Structures are given as structure tokens and as C-alpha cells.
Amino acid sequence: MSHPDVLKRGEEFLAEYPRTAPWWNYVSHATCFGMLMGSKALINLFYKPHVHNVEKLDFALEKARRENRALLTVMNHMSVVDDPGFFSLLPMRFLTDIDTVRWGFGAHNICFSTPALSWFFNLGKILGTKRPFQGSVDAAIRILSPDDTLDLEFSPWAKEVEKPSLIQEINNLGSMVPENLGLAVKTAKPSAEATNILMSKLPFIRTKTSWFHVFPEGFVLQLEEPENNSMRYFKWGISRLILESTRAPVVLPVYSYGFEKIVPEDSQSDGIKRWLPHNIGAEIHVTFGDAIADEKLENYRKEWRKLCAKYSDPKTPGDLSLELKHGKKAQNLRSQLAADLRDHVLAIREGLGKFAPEKAKFKDPAFWHDYTVTEGASDESVKFIGKNWAIKRLQKHLPEYEDEGH
């Protein structure tokens, strides 16, 4: 269930850079390809990388494209080089098409601290993040929404407001539009020719549905043994991508380890040495799990549609109401979905048989809230390697930082 204003904000965010310029995709692909090939060369030279079950990624991407859906991959976050490291280890067939190169999020304070870096990471298909309700998340929802799909059942006023280009296509139906616009959405689909025209109006150009890769923990986590390679809870921004896209993406869990050996968090104060190879010869493993059942995702989306119908704000019907943003029922639904996604990633970890079983407390947002607020005093048995970057005083460079991880 999508809201027109969310899609509109997403398009406005993407339009901040000239993504529709004829040269953009060429330069973007060159940027991505150069970075990924450089990473691939370095990792293969200094380390021992292994990618497991890549056929599951092949199947998920093929299924997504065949069913006109996006692909969403979710992975644990062990190192600042997880991306591009993870993507660079994939076979070359994933690197040669700009529409198959993943989109992703990047920390605003690291990736977008200067105009030059902002251009570089935008060309690299990375969006800057600060908070759960922000332009980059709206943009991700728009990216995950196929260009010829609409979901306006709750927007009968659509003709009276400024709309994203896709919504304008429905208005072109003129007198064909019934009072129930949702019926028009279900029965009137843009032709392939119309879709090409629509894509030229969008703030980015693509010929296939997209792939978005997310680290739902939000922050890198490196813990000392026996808690090593555990995860934080998953922030519910990831849930918005699944609940609010016009069509549910194919969701594929991924678990990795070994990237933390390349850049250990306790090398933070080593200056330039931090970015030199550490632990040369270490193994790096990326393992793909099974795609999450479509029925499970649809059950969550069904509950979301019920909440949208019940808590729509008549004053701003095309947008998320305060209740849909911050109400307990909406937060609980997003939290449940985020926890479910985490369980799927955790199942891959546990199935490896390499690490001690993860402590149940690590999936609890309340544990991490207390641990972070007290800067570790609430549970001194859990030891960080390096810093816990979720601590607010370490995030002063983000004036809009909020602890919104329910």
C-alpha cells in the first residue's frame, strides 16, 4: 500500500541529481564497475573469498524480473567495507548491467560529507540516511515500486493534487476513471510503449526492476568472543520498504563474515593504517538463504492496508498520518516484520555451525536501547571491538539524529 506523497517525496529526492541525463547511467555504471572491480581485485589478492548458494540469488532476481517486482536483499553489518565488498565478490554477470547493480543506503556523515563524495556515492547508487521518515527511505520505496504499477485504493482525490509522473498516467484516462480509482488502477495498466514514455519522465532511468540491498542494523557491529558475529536488532526502516512499495519485493536474506577482518573497528584510531589490509589471508564468506515466502510478506502488507484504511488523516489523505508514522499498532507491525527478517538472516548464521548460538537478548530493541544509553554499563559481559556508533554523543555530526529504531 503506497501513498502518493511518499512516492512524490521519493521522486523529488532522486531528482536532486541529474539521473535522467543521457550520460548519467554511463557514468554511474563506470563508477560502480570501477569500484567493484577494484574491490574484487584487492579481496582476491589479499584474502580467501567464498560465495555460497549464489544460485539462490540468481533465482530470486529472475523471479523478481519475471513477476515485475523488485529484489530486496537484507544482510548483517560487520564492517565498513561490507559494501562494496559483498557485491564485488559476486560473479561478473551481476556487474555488467547498470540495472542489476544494487542500490543501497550509506551513512550520511561518512558518504556524503563533501560535495565530491556526495556525487561519487550518488553515482554509485547509494542514498544517504539519517532517520526512518526521510527522503532517502521514500526514494527507496519509489525505487522498489515497478514503474508500471500503482496502488491508489486509498487516494480517490488523486486528480486534485500534484502527483508523481506514474499517477499522471491514470489521470490521462479522463472519463474512463470511475469513482473508485482503485478499480481503475487494477484494470488500466500502461502499455509497454507508455511505460517507456513514463520512464523518461522519472528522476532515474531503468529498463528493468531494481535491486536494493540493505543493512537493517544501521550500524556496524563487532563484538568480542563469544558474542562475535552476532547482530543488533533490525531497525524498522526496512519494514517500510516492504509495506509501502506498490508491489511486494522478492526478499532474500544474506549472512556474511570475514569482512570484519579487513577493517577491524579497533583500528579506528590508526589513521591511514586503518584503510590498509589487515589480517591478510583471512577467509571471507557470503551465504545466501532462501527467499522469504510471498505469503508471509503479503500477510504483513494486508495488515498494513487495514491500518491505512483505519488511520488515514482526512486533512492529508495522500500521506502517512501521524498514527501511521508513530502509532503503537503501526510501530508494532513494523517491528514484527523487522524481527521476522532478522530471524531469517539469523537462521543462515546458525546453520553454518561456526559460531556459538546467538544470545536471545540481542534481538530485543530494549536491550540495545539500555546498552547504548548506559554506554555498555547495563551488560558489561558484552564487549565491543572499537566503538558502539549508536551512542548519541558519537553522532553529534548528525543534527537530526534520533533514536527511532522501534
Where are these regions (language model features)?
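Fungal C-terminal region signature
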Residues: 2-5, 9, 293-406
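Soluble catalytic domains of membrane acyltransferases
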Residues: 48-303
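Charge-dense, low-complexity intrinsically disordered segments
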Residues: 25, 29, 228, 328-335
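A transmembrane-helix-recognition feature enriched in membrane-embedded lipid enzymes
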Residues: 4-54, 88, 93, 116-123
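Short interface patches used for recognition in eukaryotic signaling and trafficking proteins
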Residues: 21-23, 72, 326
